[in-house]
Amino acid sequence: MITLNNQDQPVPFNNSYPDEYEIAALVFYSCIFIIGLFVNITALWVFSCTTKKRTTVTIYMMNVALVDLIFIMTLPFRMFYYAKDEWPFGEYFCQILGALTVFYPSIALWLLAFISADRYMAIVQPKYAKELKNTCKAVLACVGVWIMTLTTTIPLLLLHKDPDKDSTPATCLKISDIVYLKAVNVLNFTRLTFFFLIPLFIMIGCYLVIIHNLLHGRTSKLKPKVKEKSIRIIITLLVQVLVCFMPFHICFAFLMLGTGENSYSPWGAFTTFLMNLSTCLDVILYYIVSKQFQARVISVMLYRNYLRGMRRKSFRSGSLRSLSNINSEML
């Protein structure tokens, strides 16, 4: 099987993957699907249906939950592929899933950048606090990012063909890791700059200014609760970007710069796993931002504890009844 390298020369494409990778992918994606589905459905319901006073952060969180859900709903197809070692869903659907591997981190990073800018306004520019309630601007910003991300992702459906599409059984190499994305470097470098470096610099700039103002006591007029909440959000965003998105994009850049055989890349597979992990780590953001989400999570946990307690009581009562029956028979 062949594909093209950076110089548009055909090179072999090795479609063999270690058994350990397929087992790890099955276990990992199963956990991500179960946790992420519950977390993001709950978040989307809370932010869209139960939140009475919507702010700009609420709008951004609704979009984060929606993007997470779209990506999570593709995981069962990935799990089927790793379990069966074949792809019965057709090449076009394979291309869509491969494109979503690029679409998700692109739009997620811009949404996180918007949240960072929002916290900058809340801490550094409290006199513009009214703007934080202007949800119309937040909606327009989100719509703009959706349009831009879709516009730059759609070419992936047109430019990339599965090099192994005629094999038996059929495969879908695009969803394994990001190694197949090497073919069109001009588009990839543009995407890397606009959808990773620019939002990353926005976040870093906001964080540096916020830290500078906090250290020099220029936020004394700010309520302690608002300050504490904003700091928690900033730390959460920073950890999420460093753990989930930065390794993925660094690997992406090295793959574009590299030449030679396109084959299974442990580093590419691992960083793709980390990127998927972001769909679950967003629960920390939801929990910090929304009291309604906190209440919903706590109620679910309490209900599970209640059910567990009821099972223990029924088990104990059943054991006591059995013991009394045995004693009566002995008497």
Swiss-Prot record:
Membrane topology: Multi-pass membrane protein
Transmembrane spans: 27-47, 57-77, 96-116, 139-159, 192-212, 233-253, 269-289
Assigned GO CC terms: cytoplasmic vesicle membrane; plasma membrane
Alphabetically ordered keywords of this record: Cell membrane, Cytoplasmic vesicle, Disulfide bond, G-protein coupled receptor, Glycoprotein, Membrane, Phosphoprotein, Receptor, Transducer, Transmembrane, Transmembrane helix
Modified residues (Phosphoserine): S322
Topological domains annotated Cytoplasmic: 48-56, 117-138, 213-232, 290-331
One GO biological process term: phospholipase C-activating G protein-coupled receptor signaling pathway
Topological domains annotated Extracellular: 1-26, 78-95, 160-191, 254-268
Cysteines joined through disulfide linkages: C94-C172
Predominant localisation class: membrane
Organism domain of life: Eukaryota
A GO molecular-function descriptor: G protein-coupled receptor activity
Subcellular compartments: Cell membrane; Cytoplasmic vesicle membrane
Residues annotated as glycosylated: N14, N188
Any Pfam family hit: 7tm_1
Gene3D superfamilies per record: Rhodopsin 7-helix transmembrane proteins (1.20.1070.10)
Similarity comment: family membership: Belongs to the G-protein coupled receptor 1 family.
Described function: G protein-coupled receptor (GPCR) that plays a role in diverse physiological processes particularly within the immune and nervous systems. Becomes active when triggered by various endogenous ligands including endocannabinoid N-arachidonyl glycine (NAGly), delta-9-tetrahydrocannabinol or resolvin D2/RvD2 derived from the omega-3 fatty acid docosahexaenoic acid (DHA). Upon RvD2 binding, facilitates the resolution of inflammation, aiding in tissue repair and homeostasis.
Protein name: N-arachidonyl glycine receptor
Organism of this sequence: Macaca fascicularis
